[in-house]
Amino acid sequence: MERDQHQEICNDGGLLCESKEVSVNNHNSDAVEESEDTITSGNQEVSPANGPTLPILQKIIDCSDKIKILKDEHALVSNQVQEIKNCSLVEPEISRALQLLTTKLGALEKQYLEESSERKRLYNEVIELKGNIRVFCRCRPLNQAEIANGCASVAEFDTTQENELQILSSDSSKKHFKFDHVFKPDDGQETVFAQTKPIVTSVLDGYNVCIFAYGQTGTGKTFTMEGTPENRGVNYRTLEELFRCSESKSHLMKFELSVSMLEVYNEKIRDLLVDNSNQPPKKLEVKQSAEGTQEVPGLVEAQVYNTDGVWDLLKKGYAVRSVGSTAANEQSSRSHCLLRVTVKGENLINGQRTRSHLWLVDLAGSERVGKVEVEGERLKESQFINKSLSALGDVISALASKTSHIPYRNSKLTHMLQNSLGGDCKTLMFVQISPSSADLGETLCSLNFASRVRGIESGPARKQADVSELLKSKQMAEKLKHEEKETKKLQDNVQSLQLRLTAREHICRGLQDKVRDLEFQLAEERKTRIKQESRALATASSTTTTTSRHLRETLPTIIEKKPPLAPTRMRMPLRRITNFMPQQQPSQGHSKRFSDTTFKENNNSNRRSSSMDVNTLMKPRRSSIAFRPAPAPSAIASSNKTIMPRRRVSIATLRPEPSSLSSMETPSRPPPSFRGDPRKARYSKLFSPDRNLVTPNAMKSSRFMKSPLGGGGSSWKPSHPTVIALQKKAVVWSPLKFKNRRPSLVAIRSSASSSSASDLLRREQ
């Protein structure tokens, strides 16, 4: 009871256990002493009620031993607690250490990736140095039938040389053959796959790989490639290794595996994974893809996730493969079986994708028709098998001799293996031979063929990018090229527009300069015109008095006779009515009426005021004169005064042409048509309008100007109708027509001159 309490106290806490330790020890020591005294005193002291005391002492001793054990355990627990307390004090150091380890782990992972990529590169380089097409030779052991027939082995192997083989020929000579590796008859499937595994794993790195077995019938090709459920061959072991490698690289790469299986039977392609149905099999053909690889459209491609699924597919395909019995082999393959494994990989770090193929080919054996004793359907199969193998031999010979043309299309088999034999593919060939002396000829043929294959140099293999990614890249490249072309076109258009804009700006600046020059010229011409008009006004005012005197002298003569028109032949055709004076012809009969000084003054003043050629501006004009009929003779006789009719000349003037802006004065010389008739010249001189009045005041909307107004500022209407003779003519306007429109600076006839003319007419009446 006391022990249990002590144990409970010890379980509750170390302090209570330590406090009770002394009392327990004292109690134990007392008990031990009492027991010793009792024992030493002898066994005679026995209590009849309690019985013997020896078992109690033994129990006490046992309890003391247990207490010691508990004490040791307590000390151990105390030490652990103390260590935990010490660890809690160094927690920051632990966190720092963890961070350091994490950093080192990241660096190691990065270094691992670099080393892994370097290992892949070096490994692939070693494979390429050995040759893209590697040849392994495998010799099967003698079977029971051959041993029973007394056939000897003609193959000799050197244990020190793993890649050499000697064949004893019929003349007792030895022929040496050298390959990448030679497997002896006692080598198992594991040994064979151990040498095959390095090239198989290249498919995970993005390389195309092809493994095929060649040899005569009955040499173990199907056993090497397919194997048995107990001793599986290369096909199953290869897929198993691919799954194992893909799982080990799952943190770096993501892989997807799919399997297709077909056979070439009598030069016809047959899908071995298609579901059996009553429908006839679909015809399959070899086609070349856009990337240059050979594909079989319509072929079933089953995705696999583990080795069990792979084995189920392989058993399904092997079950429907064409197999027949011959004299050489009871289970002879009558077709070429091809297993294609498609591996799609994606790098989880940089996103790079690959798509590669692994071809596992079990070729049908070459046969001698006479030896295998076949006929009928088997004979036809043998002929097709030998034909396809002969085409394969032609391809190998062409590749070895490096001819320009390789006859891949001579057979469906060689057409499908085109990339594997002469392309960027890593190829491995198993040449299967028989050691029997009865098959010596076929063995030598197979070994010679394998030697030619080993001598082929097809160049280094390269990685296969994913077709979908390649197509996307091509589309993006084409789109980029198209965009570059469009950008170049737009840039050319922009440059041409900039050139055109520069040319337009240059033209605009030139036109602006021309406009400024024209404005300057116009301003100068206006100044010149103002000066000329000022001089013309001064000249007109000086000649007003002379004109009044001439009117008084010539009016009586005009009343008596109407001025005749010029003869028809001499008359000029009617033209536009102008405000220019006709030139005066010299007259012999009436030269005294008009003073020479008057004509000279007028001519001199007109010549000074005009700056343009007079001959080009003089044109015939027509005037209309209105006058009152003459009175009766009695009225004339009774009147002492001479009654003069009221007359007025109405003239329609046309706006001057833009080219005639430099000078608007009327020439003083009369036209040539009036030179022969002095009276016409007199009337033209008499009734010609004043130069100051016929000059237009401003550029108005009307094409013609009215007759000049009378003096006094009041409008005057004629009492007789006015006749206007016009001739329509197109007028060319100046582009500066409405530029800075200003009224004419020519003043209307002054009131002084107007009043003098009206007073003169009133006195004459």
Swiss-Prot record:
Biased composition (Low complexity): 602-611
UniProt xrefs under PROSITE patterns: KINESIN_MOTOR_1, KINESIN_MOTOR_2
Gene Ontology terms: cellular component: microtubule
Keywords, ordered alphabetically: ATP-binding, Coiled coil, Microtubule, Motor protein, Nucleotide-binding
A GO molecular-function annotation: microtubule motor activity
Record InterPro entries: Kinesin-like_fam, Kinesin_motor_CS, Kinesin_motor_dom, Kinesin_motor_dom_sf, P-loop_NTPase
Entry coiled-coil feature ranges: 469-534
Organism ancestry: Eukaryota, Viridiplantae, Streptophyta, Embryophyta, Tracheophyta
SMART domains according to UniProt: KISc
Protein name per UniProt: Kinesin-like protein KIN-14S
Family classification: Belongs to the TRAFAC class myosin-kinesin ATPase superfamily. Kinesin family. KIN-14 subfamily.
Binding site for ATP: G215, Q216, T217, G218, T219, G220, K221, T222
One Pfam family named in its UniProt record: Kinesin
Single GO biological process annotation from the record: microtubule-based movement
Species: Arabidopsis thaliana
Region entry Disordered, spans: 581-613, 654-678
Gene that specifies this protein: KIN14S
Domain Kinesin motor residues, every copy: 132-456
